[in-house]
Amino acid sequence: IKLAKHAGMAVMDMYNKNIRPRDIMTKEAILNALTVDMALGCSTNSMLHLPAIAHEVGFDFDISFANPISEKTPNLCHLAPAGPTYMEDLNEAGGVYAVMKELADIGLLNTDCMTVTGKTVGENIKNAVNKNPEVIRPVDNPYSKTGGLAVLKGNLAPDGGVVKRSAVVDEM
């Protein structure tokens, strides 16, 4: 209930600041979201939700966007169920902001995007610190040099299928 109350307060704060959904949900913000997801190890659900959000704001997003972003985004976290660490560990290590700071430091995020805080991504992550490099690996020591998802195409999935590459064992 506490989280719901805080979410409601945040919505009202955005309303009072005249920050509208289309100010936040831009093409750049959606690509940032996919990049961060790749670094976190990903959820295949991202490839359902991000295109739907993009459609609502008039951005033609398709699953083929995943591979180029994955190829340049290091996988920095190995979270359960695919890995040994949990969301609580990520939070204690500096949270998503610390992951975003790692990515921004190598130019993988658009830091000018407006966020729900009323500040830009860059302003939000400016003071983020990675407190545990075993939970959030630095970009020069990732779990993998590529992001957590891959889109595969072939005779079984001519339009593409999504695999959570970060959960696949190396032998495969």
How should these model regions be labeled?
Residues 1-172:
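Catalytic or ion-coupling anion/metal-binding cores of large enzyme and transporter domains
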